[in-house]
């Protein structure tokens, strides 16, 4: 068995029976641990013995800073290194996503787990989530500070608009693909979207696709700006990204909107 204690959660010492992984309570944070152990077992990597695990983290829970993905990837690293399993960092990211999808019942993307598993100091990652092809982009801040602020709005992916937005995008993709042979919204560029947006019948779905298409373009522009050290352009793209998330994708919320708008009013803020 595995004994787990979290200094953050303040619970008693919790026990997980090796090989008997069940979701007893959907809000139980140990489901993320169980899910990763379950994902190893699905790959026929069974833990030969248990362990005692003491956990502490400095990410605020539920702040949209990938604390669940961080826990999943951490458990993956521990299990791989302790038991000598042959899995790559990308494998661990995918297993974390699989744990959320199939064990925890949360429909999530791969970005969080990939960033945690593959992160590199002083670099951003340009990731193609369709192919998992990636490129490290050096970040040279040159006197500019990157500030991470907590809006204090609690975020749970399972309770967020993620699943609803994903369904809207998938429905829109079905509509568009009847006119042109695409398999994902990332196959659309802005010019093609402008030509075929009438194939999407619902105005809300149109705005969701507009966000996806323009965000892809902004991401590529942002990578180029970082490579060239053009931080002002990068900041402008970040601002445009938030505005699109707020107005077209509608996932930011009043707290995040207020925080970003207050930041934009400060002298020296690039985005």
Over which residues does each language-model region extend?
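Hydrophobic side chains within alpha-helical segments
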Residues: 115-116, 218
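Short, well-structured alpha-helical segments that form the helix of a local strand-helix-strand
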Residues: 88-100, 233-241
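Short amphipathic alpha-helical interaction patches enriched in hydrophobic/aromatic residues
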Residues: 79-83, 100, 242-245, 249
């Amino acid at each position: 068995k595995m004994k787990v204690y979290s200094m953050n959660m303040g619970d008693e010492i919790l026990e997980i029976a090796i090989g008997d992984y069940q979701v007893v309570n959907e809000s139980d944070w140990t489901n993320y641990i169980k899910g990763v152990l379950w994902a190893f077992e699905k790959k026929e990597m069974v833990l030969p013995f248990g362990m005692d695990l003491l956990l502490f983290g400095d990410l605020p829970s539920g702040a949209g800073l990938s604390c669940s993905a961080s826990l999943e990837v951490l458990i993956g690293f521990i299990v791989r290194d302790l038991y000598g399993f042959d899995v790559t960092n990308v494998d661990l990211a995918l297993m974390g996503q699989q744990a959320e999808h199939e064990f925890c019942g949360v429909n999530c993307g791969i970005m969080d787990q990939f960033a945690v598993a593959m992160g590199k100091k002083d670099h951003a990652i340009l990731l193609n989530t369709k192919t998992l092809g990636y490129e490290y982009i050096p970040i040279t801040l040159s006197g500019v500070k990157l500030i991470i602020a907590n809006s204090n709005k609690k975020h749970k992916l399972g309770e967020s608009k993620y699943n609803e937005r994903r369904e809207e995008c998938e429905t829109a993709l079905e509509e568009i693909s009847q006119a042109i042979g695409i398999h994902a919204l990332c196959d659309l560029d802005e010019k093609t979207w402008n030509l075929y947006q009438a194939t999407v019948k619902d105005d809300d779905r149109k705005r969701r696709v507009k966000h996806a298409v323009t965000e892809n373009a902004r991401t590529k522009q942002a990578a180029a700006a970082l490579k060239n050290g053009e931080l002002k352009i990068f900041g402008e793209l970040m601002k445009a990204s938030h505005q699109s998330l707020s107005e077209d994708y509608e996932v930011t919320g009043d707290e995040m909107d207020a925080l970003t708008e207050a930041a934009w009013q400060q002298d020296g803020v690039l985005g």
